[in-house]
Amino acid sequence: MDSAKTCVTKFKSFAILLFTPILMLPLVILIPDKFARCAYVIVIMAVYWCTDVIPVAVTSLLPVLLFPLLKVLDSKQVCIQYMKDTNMLFLGSLIVAVAVERWKLHKRVALRMLLFVGTKPSRLMLGFMFVTAFLSMWISNTAATAMMIPIVEAMLQQMIAANTAVEASLGTLELLDKNKTSELPGSQVVFEDPNVQEQEDEETKNMYKAMHLCVCYSASIGGTATLTGTGPNVVLLGQMQELFPDSKDVLNYASWFGFAFPNMVMMLVLAWLWLQCLYMRHNLKKTCICCGEKKRDTEKIAYKVLNEEYQKLGSLSYPECNVLFCFTLLVILWFSRDPGFMPGWLSFAWVEGNTVHITDATVAIFVAILLFIIPSQKPKFNFSSQTEEERKTPFYPPALLDWKVAQEKVPWDIVLLLGGGFAMAKGCETSGLSKWMAAQMEPLRLVKPAVITLILSCLVAMTTECTSNVATTTLFLPIFASMARSIGIHPLYVMIPCTMSASLAFMLPVATPPNAIVFAYGHLRVVDMMKTGLIMNFVGILSVFLSVNTWGRAMFNLDNFPDWANSTSVNT
């Protein structure tokens, strides 16, 4: 039976791999345009990504083959997409995360946080979500996720180990109590129900899925709260200044924060509830605050186990201090580079006109390089006090990180995954697929503004699953601005929801770097992300719609068509 099932699975994978390109050929044959050829490649990649018939990283390389072959892009245009600024930001962040993991700083932080928060999974998840979202407000979503995931991984391992020990202890005590009248002297029999064990394993897997998804989701959600928190927000600000120069300061750091921060909190709470219901519903009663005495005793034992593990780490070591310094330096430099509400250190010497010479990627690579330089041991400058053995060792101790460790620990396949997403976005732009999609929106002129907003938000949320969110907003916002002006509605009534919908990339690993980072840890399948992310997309779209139509109307005066929009010529 198992062999037959394996054969069917293999045949299914082979059939999808072979017949998907063949079945989609009419798209290229019947529509002899470049945008149709681009759509052909995107559909194939989407199917392969969703079904995992070949490795995700290999699917990401398809544009390098198919775009030049189908004359969508030449080879040089495609290949350059695989090592862009965002890829370097991602790589630098992961190298820092590897250093944190190597010296077990994440374990120390994880145990300390776990001791403070407790072992209730629901409380842990909510804490992770708000911390990650807060970080994403000020630093890049990619960096926040790359820094939080090792901590999440360590906390989960410690929590599962502690709870397993507690359950085994309580189970043994309960068994002894039930059998104390019939137990033979010096003997003890323990019976394990395989169904119970299977259920516990499934609950553990679900907890891993929920905890990892909550981090990448909250990173994407948290970035929406500030103008500089994520790329689409910055694109919106730039498009407003370019398309509507008379709008002056209608959209600034303070006004955006006042609108977007409450929406972020609402989305985080809804996301937490959805993840709890989907993956941890069996634990809802166990994790309730008002639980019984038995649960409180369990938590006491778990706390004792965790505290013992924490004590084993000893005091903060020299390499841990250096890694902590590098991590703190990274966060401070990211935050202070260009905070938005005040001039950052970037403006002192590295901005010339519209050219910005230093990005977050520069900072990430700088700190990553430091990790290969800063020593992991204290250098001894007093040669007279050194022993004979110490004199034989090199003067400068080994660095915090060496290339062998970095090469083994960094998930290089995810770099290709991100590059594939950028190549797809470039193909859409160059082939005219984005213009074709805009032409399909002409009938929306006859629809009510609220319905237009919902439809366009869904369109953007769908598009951003396959292309970068920055590219999506860059392509769509000028079109939406022109449409809003032509039908006489406030441009921000359409542009704000669509900008925020570009951050609702919850369904695919390639959709956004936080998803890719989480996916790299191996606890999730593409199907898991699609199942969870589909509802998250609807939750996000409806939350943004509610925000725009309540306090957003009052803040931006969305009920009235502004003079600055009427007097501006918008060119798409």
UniProtKB/Swiss-Prot annotation:
The gene is Slc13a5. The keyword Nucleotidyltransferase does not apply. Inhibited by Li(+). InterPro entries: Na/sul_symport_CS, SLC13A/DASS. Glycans are attached at N382, N566. It catalyses: citrate(out) + 4 Na(+)(out) = citrate(in) + 4 Na(+)(in). Its main location: membrane. Optimum pH is 7.0 for citrate. GO terms for molecular function: citrate transmembrane transporter activity; organic acid:sodium symporter activity; succinate transmembrane transporter activity; tricarboxylic acid transmembrane transporter activity. One of its GO terms (biological process) is alpha-ketoglutarate transport. The keyword Transport applies. GO terms for cellular component: cytosol; nucleoplasm; plasma membrane. It is a multi-pass membrane protein. It comes from the Eukaryota. The lineage of its organism: Eukaryota, Metazoa, Chordata, Craniata, Vertebrata. It is found in: Cell membrane. This is Na(+)/citrate cotransporter. Keywords: Cell membrane, Glycoprotein, Ion transport, Membrane, Sodium, Sodium transport, Symport, Transmembrane, Transmembrane helix, Transport.
